A protein has these predicted regions:
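Divalent metal-coordination and catalytic microenvironments
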Residues: 8, 20, 32, 83, ...
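C-terminal regulatory/interaction regions
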Residues: 195-269
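A short catalytic or substrate-binding loop motif that flags glycine-/basic-rich loops and adjacent residues
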Residues: 81-83, 103-106, 269
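Short, charged, surface-exposed secondary-structure boundary motifs
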Residues: 38-43, 130-134, 197
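Active-site HxH/HxHxD metal-binding segment of metal-dependent hydrolases
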Residues: 1-90, 184
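Metallo-beta-lactamase
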Residues: 96-188
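Aromatic/hydrophobic pocket-lining residues that form the small-molecule binding cavity
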Residues: 14, 150, 236
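A structural signal for the main folded, soluble domain(s) of proteins
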Residues: 2, 15, 20-23, 27-30, ...
Length: 269
């Protein structure tokens, strides 16, 4: 094994890097430059990505689930290279892979494009309307975090000349129409979620919490089990951050948990 390119920082994608290095000492480990800190440190990955909503929102995993998440990673492991997008890997005389930057699910999320076969390996870069189990049942909501970047990634894939795209939790998609439909499904979820969040905040003038938005909007946004409703914290927090930046929402950070409202300018409008 010459290369192991890690698409993004989640335990099921980077947790085995130390074991890969142990088994294949010569391997070059690589990841997105903006994700390096989390990928190299399981402790930082857990605190920044999986325990991110504890202090300000009172949302966190129960001890057993938290331990299961930690168990996905073996030990800390440095990477050899980081990529920012635009690089190429030559695997053979006629085999070149392009490194694409596909942020949204993480800041440094990478994709690998095999131009000779018009095949994109996109990891978790776009997520349709959520995750399904191998039995075809809805199991989890979309878990993007950075809305504008995620929408740009959808556009990037949609506009590419890829004719086959391979993700990590979704069926392989063949042909322009299938790819276009999945991109549209991914974008439509974002639009629908943003609308629902805005309407809910508008209808609750005294303010709402992130937990409340997750539990109250879960059934309106998808068919995954109610037990995983709080996983919406990832996407919804991204929409809230974007709304605050755009002046649509305001946040009271003196409250614990944080409370969100329409901004004064939005209410006046």
């Amino acid at each position: 094994m010459a290369w192991a390119v890690i698409t993004h920082p989640d335990g099921d994608h980077c947790g085995g890097s130390a074991e890969i290095k142990r088994r294949y000492p010569q391997v070059r480990l690589a990841c997105g430059d903006l994700d390096r800190a989390m990928i190299e440190s399981p402790d930082y990955l857990f605190s920044f990505r999986y325990d991110a909503y504890r202090a300000n929102h009172g949302i966190y995993f129960d001890p057993k689930t938290a331990q299961d998440i930690k168990n996905c990673s073996s030990s800390a492991q440095a990477v050899t290279f980081t990529f920012v997008g635009g690089e190429t890997l030559r695997l053979g005389e006629n085999r070149i892979l392009e490194i694409w930057h596909l942020p949204g699910h993480s800041h440094g999320h990478l994709g690998l494009y095999d131009r000779s076969h018009r095949t994109l390996y996109y990891g978790d870069a776009i997520q349709g309307a959520g995750y399904k189990s191998v039995q075809g049942m809805w199991s989890l909501c979309p878990t993007y975090l950075y809305v504008n970047a995620y929408l740009q990634t959808i556009r990037t894939i949609e506009a590419s000349d890829a004719e086959l795209i391979v993700g990590c939790h979704w069926p392989v998609l063949r042909g322009k129409e299938a790819i276009r439909q999945f991109c549209a499904e991914s974008r439509n979820f974002v639009t629908h979620a943003d609308r629902r969040i805005t309407h809910y905040i508008r209808d609750h003038r005294s303010g709402v919490t992130l937990r409340e938005l997750c539990t109250e909007l879960s059934e309106q946004l998808g068919e995954w089990p109610l037990a995983v409703s709080l996983e919406l914290a990832n996407a919804i927090s991204g929409h809230l951050d974007r709304g605050i930046e755009a002046g649509r929402f305001a946040v009271d950070r003196s409250a614990c948990p944080f409370v969100y409202r329409l901004s004064d300018k939005r209410e006046e409008g």
